[in-house]
Structure formats: C-alpha cells, structure tokens
Amino acid sequence: MIALDQILSKIMQESGSDIYILPGTPVKAKVRGQMEQLGEERCSVQDCADLLQEIYALAGGRSMKRLEEVGDDDFSFSLAAVGRFRCSAYRQRGSYGAVLRAVPFSIPDAEKLHIPKAVMDLFSLKRGMVLVTGPAGSGK
C-alpha cells in the first residue's frame, strides 16, 4: 500500500487536485483533469481505515468520533513543506472512504493564471458586487 505522505507529495508535485481513497480500488488522483492510479494495489477496508487514521492524526489529532457517529466529516489539515488539504471522509456500506482536495500554500499570480486585465480591473471597483461562479475545480 502506498504511504500517505507519498500520496500527498505526489499530488502536489504533479499539480493534482483531488485524491480518492475508496475500498476495493487503488488510490486514485485527478491530475490535470484526468484520473490516475497511484500504485496497483487495491485498498482493503482496513487500508482505508488506516489511511483515514493517519489523515486524522495530521489534522492535529482530530477525533474520528463525528465520522463514526454521523457517517461523514469535513475538515482540513496541512503537511509541512507539502501543502494543505481539505478532507471529506465518509462511511458507506460499513467501510470508510475519503476524498481529499489539494490546496497549495502559494497563490499563483494573475499572469501565470492568464487572468485578463479587464477581470483584474474589477478589484479596483468601489461599489457593487462581483460574482465569480463556476463548477468545482474550475479555478474560481
């Protein structure tokens, strides 16, 4: 089974966005819009539970009580020199799974993101409201 720190480091190095930890399948990641397997080994129910325990430990020793009682939990955690992550953990059919969203420490500048000057000029407006909308993962 691939180690959690390797999973998290790999996703940040490859500019991935999401990590999927599900029993019965290898750990998967979304990288540049494409799903990739991280290793060949399928996660057993116990592997998923073990990875979740590690994730909760990284979240400052957060208790798994809510997950066990309610069946889901959402929280964030950081791994020094790697990045921040949001975690949606859940219980389904008696086993645990999780989806992690990578949140890089640094924010790229507008030029690197190819944001037009007209959009950047909106930041200087003194009145009104600017809505930025779009689907999850679209770069809002």
Language model regions located:
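Conserved glycine(s) of the Walker
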Residues: 139
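N-terminal "pre-motor" subdomain/linker immediately upstream of P-loop NTPase catalytic cores
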Residues: 1-135
